[in-house]
Every structure is written in C-alpha cells, then in structure tokens.
C-alpha cells in the first residue's frame, strides 16, 4: 500500500470511533468504599470504558470520594483527561444521594445542566439533567436524563419521567434525549404488565435499548433488568451501534463476593457511531506534516 493511501485509510478509521455512554448504580459509594484498593481498581476500569458515565447512589458526605476517584481515573487512563459534574445532594430525608457525571473533556463538554423542578414531589431523587456536546455533525449535542427510582414508587416515577422528557425537550428544543439509570424496572418492583402501560412504552419514539430480558444484577440468584437506557430522537437512534449490560465480574475475573464489594448492579452502556467528517479535521495538520516528511520518498529526485 502506498503511503498516501495508508494515511488516508488511517484517517478514515480514526474518524469512525464509537462514543460510549454509561450508567452505573455504584451502591452506596462512600470515601471508605473507594479507599479500598480492589474497589478503586475496578471502578476505575469500569469508568475508563465510557466517554460519559452517570454514577448513581453516591452517598459520600465527606465530599472527597469523587475527587479521589477522578484523580485515580486520570492516572489510569492517559488517553485524555476526565472531568466531573455533580448534582446537589438529593432526597426527602436525611438519606440523600448525588448523581455524578464523569466525562472525557477532550471529546465532550457540558453545555448546560439543572436539577428538574419537581414541584409535586414525585421523585425521591429528581433527575439531574445535562446537555453535552458531541463530536458529530449529525448530532452536535445530546441531553441526558438520569434517574434512580425508589422501589416503592417505580411506576409513579417512571410515568413522571415522561413529563420530564417533555419539559427537557421543550427547554432545549431537542427531541434527542437519553433517559438512563437504575429504574428498578423489573421483577418485584415492576411487573411486565405494568411496565408495558407506562407512557414511556406506549408513546411513540422511545427505544428501550436494554431489553426486558437482560440481567443487570450481579447476584447469580437474581435475573432482573433493573437498569435501563431509553433513546428518543431520530438523529440519536440513527447513530445507535450497540447497547448492553457490562458483566464486569466476568471481564475482570471477580468472584461474586468480590463483585458485590463494588456493586450489586452491572453498568449499562450504549454506543453511538460518531463517524462524521469533522471528527477527522483535528488530524489534518498532523497528516500534512507526515506527508511533507514522506514527500522525498514518494517523489525521489531524478
């Protein structure tokens, strides 16, 4: 293969990268928990798979767990720095949780964010909505709406999540939205019959990419699709590549007991294909330099 052809091939391949968005219930994440070596090591490897990750059930009162986790993540993954965006502490009682976004800041940036105004107090932990830029001509921005429902009010909260979608899509004048998180949308918390009556199931345009039969739990004794990702918007759906729960115990060769020290949930992930022309542009100066260096070999003097 000639050098120019090879370089062009590399550029095109480089421009066809997937963009992975994840959600993970980290099960009562505290400073004491992340300070444990195996927990930290596993969390960092899970986070490093994702371009954007929404951590749920962060209950650290010290305010030190996330900065420590971010520092270790950036030490582990040298491909580009991660940044974080955290919600306020959310909850009705003294028990509160925080949603935390981890994102690769050289690939995406937070354009705007807010906590949904839950005037009727439907949500135990109201969604922390964020709009992110994407390296895509087809879909230059995307709205994420994470939710961790309470098992006692799953149906009520998920029906209210449809209202959140309507408000968010009007706020940003965009139908390209991803709803994601630990919905508790299966087994004893929500039967299949009740699930199928949700407005997020009956209204057109919502694509549940984590299937009802998927297992998002670590314990061998359970098989429940608690954690979900729901896509909306034609542009968003057109870029869909894959979606699945990530079986981290098998991948990282952990026993069930070791895995449960991390969480009793699997992360859920969706990959979008962002193979757009402007993804290639940052390489252009490098390519020109390489071509100039190779030019004597390509065009020898006569």
Swiss-Prot record:
Superkingdom: Eukaryota
Keyword hit for Cell inner membrane: no
SUPFAM superfamilies, sorted: DNase I-like
Keyword annotations from UniProtKB, A to Z: Disulfide bond, Endonuclease, Endoplasmic reticulum, Glycoprotein, Hydrolase, Nuclease, Signal
GO BP of this protein: DNA catabolic process
Cysteine disulfide links: 187-224
GO CC annotations on file: endoplasmic reticulum; nucleus
CDD domains documented for this protein: DNase1
SMART domains xref list: DNaseIc
Record's protein name: Deoxyribonuclease-1-like 1
Range of residues in the leader sequence: 1-18
Gene behind the chain: DNASE1L1
